[in-house]
Amino acid sequence: MRSPQSILAIVAFATTAIAGVVPSTEKRADDIPELDVKLTQVEGTLVKAVVTNNGDEDLNILNLNFFKDTAPVKKVSVYSQGAEVPFAGVRLRHKTSGLSPEVFTYLGPGESFEDEFDVAFTADLSQGGRIVVKAEGFASTTDTDGDTLSGVVHYKSNELEIDVDGKAAAKNFASLNQFSKRTRLTGCTGSRGSAATRAIRDSAPLAAMAAGAARNGGRAFTQYFKTNDQQVRNLVAARFDAVAREASSTTSGRTTYYCDDPYGICSPNVLAYALPSRNIISNCPAYYSLSHLTWRCHGQDRVTTSIHEFTHTPGVFSPGTDDLAYGHQAATSLSTWEALNNADSFSLFANAVYLGC
């Protein structure tokens, strides 16, 4: 385990480094259609989102980690007094191939779908007062009849202002906030326990290998992080070093790792998830259908999925990553700043280092 002093040093370095990386203002490719998201208040902290295809192409949009996902995922960012309210829901890693048809929504040009959700469920709004809600990011897409992610589309919403009743919001937040601290590795018995333990332990040397590759920079680093700048290389390496330290022990550390799904979040298309506010990681049944380490560039496996989830948890390295883009095509379309905050950029880079992609 790291000392408090070393943790504070890493946090200070991360905050300074991320602040020093200017988000790219380069325009996205013209052939990527844009989704418009219209946010309106229904009642209290209940919000409706209307997602519209503003492009001239048909879209088959993945709903996992996006609007229409029934899990407590991050659909919007919430701001109070100019600062973002920390997200307290889950971050999912889902399959990038073999996805079920029901997790996609087809939208022709000009067509829309709706979703309603309570922003107080995944953000502590008990202080009440005025908040601002908005959404911007990338949604994954596939061909109309496909089950493999093949593209990405940018989405952006209006800014919605809501006056929050703190007491009512606190009740909604409490319904998600029912987690307790447990031992480092939990519910891990039998073949699944063996598979998870092996994957966690092998995450340590792979993360260390990725840290070394990040410090050296090169083609793969530039592909995923869009720069060969030394400051960015050091920041990426520091996160991988932290993952390697955390994964080196299954009996101590800053995360609680479940081999099963104690909170009922999993679905057939979800591999694992993290609850960053509690530094909790849980594997889903689909995790165990993956190979231990894939021999396919840009592929998914148990080891890099565990690395993906470790990067989400701020107890390992703060701030934890977000889920901005999934898969090679989407991840390599991100700017440097976005890639530094994207879990799949780290897991895909580790895969590239391991296989020499």
UniProtKB/Swiss-Prot annotation:
Residues forming the catalytic site: 309
The organism's taxonomic lineage, starting at the top: Eukaryota, Fungi, Dikarya, Ascomycota, Pezizomycotina
Protein name (Swiss-Prot/TrEMBL): Neutral protease 2 homolog BDCG_00922
Pfam families: Peptidase_M35 (PF02102)
Domain of life: Eukaryota
Any GO BP: proteolysis
UniProt-annotated location(s): Secreted
Keyword Signal assigned: yes
Propeptide: 20-182
Predominant subcellular localization, coarse grouping: secreted
Endpoints of the signal sequence: 1-19
Cofactor: Zn(2+)
Catalytic function, reaction form: Preferential cleavage of bonds with hydrophobic residues in P1'. Also 3-Asn-|-Gln-4 and 8-Gly-|-Ser-9 bonds in insulin B chain
Binding site for Zn(2+): 308, 312, 323
The UniProt record lists the keyword Disulfide bond: yes
The enzyme's E.C. designation: 3.4.24.39
Any one GO molecular-function label of the UniProt entry: metalloendopeptidase activity
SUPFAM superfamilies, per database record: Metalloproteases ('zincins'), catalytic domain
One GO cellular component term: extracellular region
Family note: Belongs to the peptidase M35 family.
Function of the protein: Secreted metalloproteinase that allows assimilation of proteinaceous substrates. Shows high activities on basic nuclear substrates such as histone and protamine.
Keyword annotations of the record: Cleavage on pair of basic residues, Disulfide bond, Hydrolase, Metal-binding, Metalloprotease, Protease, Secreted, Signal, Zinc, Zymogen
Cofactor note: Binds 1 zinc ion per subunit.
InterPro entries attached to this UniProt entry: Fungal_M35_metalloproteases, MetalloPept_cat_dom_sf, Peptidase_M35
